[in-house]
């Protein structure tokens, strides 16, 4: 899906967008053309290989620190699997760089007029507070609540959060 950007274009300084000599983004070491529109995010770098072994073909493999990436096709659909490492800090770095790969023209260092929307799917482990959910059960979450405060640093936090769900969770847990 393409989303039209109504803002004026500013040049993003090198201190805010670090591009490596090979044209890749700083932490992930990916170039824009190596990114699929569907991205599976896993925490553990070892899980990247577990997911990618189901790909029909592999277009690229890129590894830097805890960030391992494979882009290929699964059932004819192009997708990327990326390890984020542990913690919200690493996830923030990963998602910020994915957005830059999708929506910044690296040559002039400006946001693209037409926005590219990525589909991010988090695949990993989780805890649960419901007694009927047992260790090893498979779950599909439609929403989540973060208590790390990260979204407070982003414009429009309340527009993307389910405030009713947050309030109900706090009330239920006594936080």
Model regions and ranges:
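Metabolite-binding pocket within alpha/beta catalytic cores that recognizes anionic/polar moieties
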Residues: 2-175
């Amino acid at each position: 899906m393409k989303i039209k950007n109504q803002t004026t274009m500013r040049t993003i300084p090198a201190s805010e967008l670090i591009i490596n000599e090979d044209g890749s983004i700083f932490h992930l070491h990916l170039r824009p053309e190596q990114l699929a529109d569907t991205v599976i995010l896993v925490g553990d770098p070892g899980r990247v290989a577990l997911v990618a072994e189901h790909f029909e073909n592999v277009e690229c493999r890129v590894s830097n620190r805890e960030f391992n990436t494979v882009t290929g096709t699964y059932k004819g659909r192009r997708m990327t699997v990326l390890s984020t490492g542990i913690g919200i800090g690493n996830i923030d770095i990963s998602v910020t760089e994915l957005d830059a790969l999708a929506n910044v023209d690296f040559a002039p260092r400006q946001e693209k007029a037409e926005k590219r929307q990525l589909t991010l799917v988090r695949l990993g482990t989780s805890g649960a507070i419901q007694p009927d959910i047992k260790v090893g059960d498979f779950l599909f979450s439609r929403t989540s609540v973060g208590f790390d405060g990260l979204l407070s640093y982003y414009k429009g936090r309340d527009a993307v959060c389910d405030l009713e769900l947050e309030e109900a969770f706090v009330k239920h847990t006594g936080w």
